Amino acid sequence: MKRTYQPSKLVRARRHGFRARMATVGGRKVIANRRRQGRKKLSA
């Protein structure tokens, strides 16, 4: 059986990147919450 995690920088950026987060209301909330928490990295 193949492992489930097959890393790809492109897929990671498209699914969890900053622009992907900003595209939806929920994603914007995620960014806002992480900003409020003071995270150094806001998204993948």
From Swiss-Prot:
Record keywords: Ribonucleoprotein, Ribosomal protein
PROSITE patterns on file: RIBOSOMAL_L34
Annotated signal sequence range: none
GO CC annotations, alphabetized: ribonucleoprotein complex; ribosome
Gene Ontology biological process: translation
NCBIfam families membership: rpmH_bact
Family assignment from sequence similarity: Belongs to the bacterial ribosomal protein bL34 family.
Name recorded for this polypeptide: Large ribosomal subunit protein bL34
Gene field: rpmH
